[in-house]
A protein has these predicted regions:
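Membrane-interface anchor segments at the N-terminal boundary of transmembrane helices
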Residues: 145-221, 225
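Membrane-interface transmembrane helices that cradle and orient dolichyl/undecaprenyl
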Residues: 1-16, 260, 264-266
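Transmembrane-embedded, aromatic-rich helix segments that form part
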Residues: 33-48, 58
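Membrane-interfacial entry segments at the cytosolic side of transmembrane helices
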Residues: 13-15, 50-63
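Membrane-interface alpha helices of multi-pass inner-membrane proteins
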Residues: 16-31, 41-42, 60, 64-68, ...
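Membrane-interface catalytic loops of GT-C/OST-like multi-pass glycosylation enzymes that act
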Residues: 30-32, 219, 232-246
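Membrane-proximal stem/loop segments at transmembrane-domain junctions that anchor or position
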Residues: 77-171
């Protein structure tokens, strides 16, 4: 999308936007939260009232996503020649799971959802339990849960990495230092890095907001982050969920660095 935005020739812009749509379609299949960046771009265009950009960018990108959807459905139906909708976990299940305890994955909720035979029954009962939990939590309880979930998603520097290396074949000294009994130093380093990183991201965000004119890319990423924050108010929480988002958020540090470099160059 960046290449398409910077391209001068119209045919090249259109081709790159279609390609971006194809790639975005694939990304959404892998992880649905990938669509947040598209929504952020749309919000920025609507807020800036640049309707020409919306048509110039939106139509070819949407075309690319539709093309990918058609191709994907054909490939999926060829390789999976049976209906998977009845056995699939519902969207409501993950919202329900995020409404109790610390808002993280729990096996009891999985067993509850699987106890119903049809997709409609699962969705209906997931919604019923979610509403019941929201009422039982009360205003203060829901607020505390939201804060806890955001802390889990954004505040844990280790990003839940240890659960992916628990079943190694051989526990070497490197394993001990990174995951095992001697991993305290490594975990402390990751947490310290995460604190510094988000402090800089927040500082850069404040700098961007305070500037009269900011790069549109920065605003798009800021809106993207706001969307993710809202999403995890409702969704089940896990430290790994921030891993695919943080690389983009690091770009929000740029406005702060620009001011620092400007001050250094002018001897301030």
């Amino acid at each position: 999308m960046f290449l398409a935005y910077e391209a001068i020739k119209m045919w090249k812009k259109t081709a790159l936007y279609v390609l971006a749509g194809l790639l975005m379609g694939l990304a959404v299949c892998i992880r649905v939260t990938s669509i947040f960046i598209l929504l952020a771009i749309m919000v920025w265009i609507l807020v800036s009232r640049n309707w020409k950009k919306l048509l110039q960018w939106g139509v070819p990108t949407l075309t690319g996503m539709i093309l990918f959807s058609i191709l994907w459905q054909g490939i999926y139906q060829y390789h999976v020649d049976f209906d998977t909708s009845e056995s699939a976990i519902t969207v409501e299940h993950f919202v329900m799971m995020g409404s109790t305890g610390d808002g993280m994955y729990n096996w009891d909720d999985v067993l509850f959802t699987k106890s119903f035979a049809t997709h409609e029954e699962r969705a209906e009962n997931n919604r019923r339990v979610w509403l019941q939990r929201v009422r039982e939590n009360g205003l203060l309880g829901n607020l505390k849960l939201i804060i806890k979930k955001e802390e889990i998603v954004w505040g844990i520097g280790a990003s839940g990495y240890s659960q992916y290396v628990e079943n190694v074949v051989e526990q070497t000294p490197c394993y001990d230092w990174m995951v095992g009994e001697k991993s305290g130093l490594f975990r402390a380093y990751m947490q310290a890095y995460n604190i510094v990183l988000f402090a800089l991201i927040l500082l850069g965000t404040v700098t961007m907001i305070s500037k009269k004119k900011s790069n549109p890319y920065m605003w798009i990423i800021g809106i993207y982050w706001c969307g993710a924050l809202v999403f995890y108010i409702f969704w089940e929480a896990h430290p790994r969920y921030s891993v695919s988002i943080v690389p983009l958020l690091t770009m929000l540090i740029v406005p702060c660095l620009e001011i620092c470099l400007f001050d250094m160059n002018h001897g301030q």
